[in-house]
Structure formats: structure tokens, C-alpha cells
Amino acid sequence: MQLSASRHIIHSLAPAFALLLLGSLAAAQSPKKSDYLGNIALCNGSDRTSLSARIDGCTALIASGQGTTTALAIAYNNRGNAYTAKGDLDRAIPDFDQSIKLDPADAKPFNNRGAAYLRKGEYDLALKAFDQAIKLNPNYGRAFVNRAGVYLKKNEYDRAARGYDEAIRLEPNLEAAWSGRCWTRAILGALQAALEDCNKVLQSSQNDAATYDSRGLIHLKTGQADAAINDFSSALRVDPKLASALYGRGLARLRNGDKAGGDIDISAAKAIQAGIDDDFMRYGVRVSN
């Protein structure tokens, strides 16, 4: 429900290995070949590579002066992704800018720059970046998901829904698109269709806080308070500070007659996200419902 760094924003990591090797025959002949290859591996990263190590690897590659222009663009893009993952958006965005300057035909850094702007709350700049990514690659499902996320933040729910539809058409296995469409359909009142989208995601992703949160909203809007509490609680087990799940659970508890528990949840949600009661009013849910 709540768009955050962990929800609906999809970054693109470009594989630099082959490009960097092909771009620098001299590096392959250098006594420091092992360092160079090691930095490629670090910059490409994996789930087990720390963000700091990825940044160090990309920085070393950039400073080496080796590789093609395209490879250098990839290194900047990958370092920007690592900075974004660390929450250092003011460093990430200049890296994406530099990647775009070096390789303006690559859609990935445009997508990633948009993701950073989205996290900063600069929605118009994010939208511009995603538009450019899609212009360069009209089949870029991840960029459609991210652009839909901007439309959600701008309360343009119909446009968001169409974006998720297109992302699913392009990449049917993209869970973020199904989860995002579930939430958007729940807001728009297409509750059965929303439920089907959420259930599809939760069949394969048991730890998806956002989708549990979205399904909780569906149950709340259909008057199933117990089911809503269960789903909001599942979301909070994964993400204890998810304000929308706290607020939704609070409403469900109030409807079940648990005033003390409901008030505690709602107060906690408001402490995390001011104005969340206004958000829920836009979603068609009020405390008095």
C-alpha cells in the first residue's frame, strides 16, 4: 500500500563484465589483472556483495581509466544503484546523470534515475526520467511499474492501473506489477480483481509486506475485519514500521470493538506518517466506516 524503497520501485543492474573485458585489452595484459577482474565482480555485485564493496569496486573501475565508454557508463549506473540502495540519493543521481551522458541510448540509467527521484519525492523529475526510459525501450516493463508508482503518489489511480496493465502484458512474471495493480484496483473499488492479483503474488512470495497490506485493505473495504487484521499483522511482521498496515489494522480493530488496540495502532501510524488519515479517506476508508 505505502510506496517505499522496498515497494514497487525496480532498479536495473547492468552486467559490466564482458563489456569491461572487451574494452580493455591492456587490462588483460596488466600485472594488476586480478585486481581489475575483482573490481568488475564487485561492481557487478550480487546479493552477497555488500553495498560498500560494490561502490568501492565501481569507483576503482571508474578511476582506472580502462574499458570502453559503454563499460564506464555501466560502472556509473551500478554505483548509482548501490548508492540508492544505501539511501544516499544525492550521490546516486549524479552517477546516473554521468551514465546517461556517456551512453544516452541506454534506458536503464534513466529508469534508475527516476527511481531515485521517486524515493526523494521529486515526482515530476521521476516521471520525466521514466518517460524517457520507456521512449528508449517501449518494452521495459520495470519502467512501466515505476512510472505507475509515480502516478500513485500523484493520486492518478486510473493512469497507475493502466501502467501496471502494460507492465504485466510485457513481463507477466513481474510480481511488483501484480502487487501494484492489486493495490491500485483496491483503491478504485475493483475489489475482486484486486484480490485475485494479491493472491497471485502471495502464492509465491510469503514475505511481501506490501501485498499483505494491500489485501488487508481489500478485506477492510469488504467488511471482513478479522481477515484484514490477519493480513495487516502479516505485513507488520515483515515491515514493523509500515504505517499503512498499522493504520489499517487500527481501523479493523476499532470495527471489532477493540478501541484500545485500534487507538494504539492508529497513533503509531500517525507518528510514522503524518496525514495518513487523509490518505485513507482518498482510498475510500474512514475511521467511522
Regions found by a protein language model. Give the residues of each.
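Residue signature of alpha-solenoid helical repeat architecture, marking inter-repeat boundaries
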Residues: 31-33, 70, 104, 138, ...
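Structural marker of alpha-solenoid helical repeat scaffolds
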Residues: 64, 68, 102, 136, ...
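N-terminal leader/linker segments that initiate helical-solenoid repeat arrays
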Residues: 26-66, 70-73, 282, 289
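Bacterial N-terminal signal peptides
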Residues: 11-24
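Boundary/linker segments of alpha-helical solenoid repeat arrays
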Residues: 69, 107-108, 141-142, 175-176, ...
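Conserved alpha-helical positions within TPR/SEL1-like repeat arrays
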Residues: 44, 74-84, 97, 108-119, ...
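Structural signature of tandem alpha-helical TPR/SEL1-like repeats
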Residues: 51-52, 87-98, 120-132, 154-166, ...
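Terminal, low-structured helical/coil segments at or just beyond the last alpha-helical repeat
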Residues: 31-39, 254-289
